[in-house]
């Protein structure tokens, strides 16, 4: 606020200086009645600039601050709401990430882990196409059950710890 006041005062002083310089130049040229009339107007303008007191400048500055302050507060409130919304979204995404991570950890990484059959050359097992399809169907069923268990665990956590953001 002080910086703005200093800038305003400096600007006003610059304007007064320019008007004074101009009036001096006009006075030196004042040789005709038309120029004399013009000089009178310039001098009146100079007096108006010089009549603005520091208290008037401060009063104008206070009026301007009072006018702008509510708008600034509204803008700050809007920004705070947006930040709150972003924090909520962040918590929601973290929760979803943790859930997906736990689900991913439950899934087998390879088919070898699913079957749990050692692949040694001495221990070769022949499987028919029907048995392979049945095994794959059982694996799919097992995955569905794991997903259901994961969902139920999440619901249980929600009921125990309160509702998590969606």
UniProtKB/Swiss-Prot annotation:
Its main location: nucleus. GO terms for cellular component: cytoplasm; DASH complex; spindle microtubule. Keywords: Cell cycle, Cell division, Centromere, Chromosome, Chromosome partition, Coiled coil, Cytoplasm, Cytoskeleton, Kinetochore, Microtubule, Mitosis, Nucleus. The keyword Hydrolase does not apply. It is found in: Nucleus; Cytoplasm, Cytoskeleton, Spindle; Chromosome, Centromere, Kinetochore. Residues 119-160 form a coiled coil. Pfam families: DASH_Spc19 (PF08287). GO terms for biological process: attachment of spindle microtubules to kinetochore; cell division; mitotic sister chromatid biorientation; protein transport along microtubule to mitotic spindle pole body. InterPro entries: DASH_Spc19 (IPR013251). Component of the DASH complex consisting of ASK1, DAD1, DAD2, DAD3, DAD4, DAM1, DUO1, HSK3, SPC19 and SPC34, with a stoichiometry of one copy of each subunit per complex. Multiple DASH complexes oligomerize to form a ring that encircles spindle microtubules and organizes the rod-like NDC80 complexes of the outer kinetochore. DASH complex oligomerization strengthens microtubule attachments. On cytoplasmic microtubules, DASH complexes appear to form patches instead of rings. Belongs to the DASH complex SPC19 family. Component of the DASH complex that connects microtubules with kinetochores and couples microtubule depolymerisation to chromosome movement; it is involved in retrieving kinetochores to the spindle poles before their re-orientation on the spindle in early mitosis and allows microtubule depolymerization to pull chromosomes apart and resist detachment during anaphase. This is DASH complex subunit SPC19. It comes from Yarrowia lipolytica (strain CLIB 122 / E 150) (Yeast).
């Amino acid at each position: 606020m002080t910086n703005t006041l200093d800038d305003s005062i400096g600007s006003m002083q610059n304007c007064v200086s320019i008007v004074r310089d101009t009036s001096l130049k006009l006075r030196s040229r004042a040789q005709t009645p038309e120029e004399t009339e013009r000089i009178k107007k310039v001098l009146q303008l100079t007096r108006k600039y010089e009549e603005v007191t520091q208290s008037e400048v401060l009063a104008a500055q206070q009026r301007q601050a009072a006018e702008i302050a509510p708008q600034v507060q509204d803008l700050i409130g809007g920004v705070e709401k947006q930040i709150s919304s972003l924090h909520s979204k962040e918590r929601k995404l973290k929760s979803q990430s943790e859930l997906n991570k736990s689900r991913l950890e439950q899934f087998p990484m390879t088919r070898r882990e699913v079957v749990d059959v050692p692949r040694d050359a001495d221990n070769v097992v022949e499987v028919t196409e029907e048995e392979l399809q049945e095994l794959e169907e059982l694996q799919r069923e097992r995955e569905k059950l794991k997903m259901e268990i994961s969902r139920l665990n999440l619901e249980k956590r929600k009921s125990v710890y309160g509702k998590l953001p969606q």
